[in-house]
């Protein structure tokens, strides 16, 4: 059953330690089965590990990582005349941060370190220095958008 009105966006409160909404969303993405305290512990412990190991500001490292991984273009599938085309579209800021956090978390969970704290700390530090699996994912997304540039005239925004 369709909605009469668009769903309202939930207001997400900023995290307690750094007063950041982006970090709060990142913690929510780490969270599994409603265990927010555990997710916060993982993120803040990873921040402590970054601070001790690399002697840099962990919050600044996190912001750099998110900024570096955030994509500017992605492809969306558009059906035109019985054929599906991969059309490059711009990514708005909120979706960009959502994709970046998802890619960083997935890349971290696939790393070989034993604990998620170590995995996350390493992946965040690498992403802040434009290295790592999450950066590769962003570059692949941009390459895909660049390869399908010819279909940009099928942009879904123009078709409505």
UniProtKB/Swiss-Prot annotation:
Subunit structure: Part of the 30S ribosomal subunit. Contacts proteins S9 and S11.
Naturally occurring in which organism (per UniProt): Rickettsia massiliae (strain Mtu5)
Family according to the record: Belongs to the universal ribosomal protein uS7 family.
Pfam families listed in its UniProt record: Ribosomal_S7 (PF00177)
GO molecular function annotations of the record: rRNA binding; structural constituent of ribosome; tRNA binding
Lineage: Bacteria, Pseudomonadati, Pseudomonadota, Alphaproteobacteria, Rickettsiales
Lineage: superkingdom: Bacteria
SUPFAM superfamilies for this protein: Ribosomal protein S7 (SSF47973)
HAMAP family linked to this entry: Ribosomal_uS7_B
Protein's gene: rpsG
Its biological purpose: One of the primary rRNA binding proteins, it binds directly to 16S rRNA where it nucleates assembly of the head domain of the 30S subunit. Is located at the subunit interface close to the decoding center, probably blocks exit of the E-site tRNA.
Protein name (Swiss-Prot/TrEMBL): Small ribosomal subunit protein uS7
GO CC annotation, single: small ribosomal subunit
This protein's UniProt keywords: Ribonucleoprotein, Ribosomal protein, RNA-binding, rRNA-binding, tRNA-binding
GO terms classed as biological process: translation
């Amino acid at each position: 059953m369709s909605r009469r009105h668009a769903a309202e966006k939930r207001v997400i409160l900023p995290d307690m330690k750094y007063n950041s909404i982006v970090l709060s969303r990142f913690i929510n993405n780490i969270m599994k089965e409603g265990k927010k305290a555990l997710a916060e512990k993982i993120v803040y412990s990873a921040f402590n590990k970054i601070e001790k190991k690399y002697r840099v500001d962990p919050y600044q490292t996190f912001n750099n990582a998110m900024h570096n991984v955030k994509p500017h273009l992605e492809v969306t599938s558009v059906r035109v005349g019985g054929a599906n085309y991969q059309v490059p579209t711009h990514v708005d800021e909120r979706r960009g941060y959502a994709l970046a956090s998802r890619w960083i978390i997935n890349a971290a969970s696939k790393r070989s370190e034993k604990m998620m704290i170590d995995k996350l700390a390493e992946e965040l530090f690498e992403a802040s220095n434009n290295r790592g699996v999450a950066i590769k994912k962003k570059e692949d997304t941009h390459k895909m958008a660049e390869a399908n540039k010819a279909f940009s005239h099928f942009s879904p925004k123009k078709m409505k």
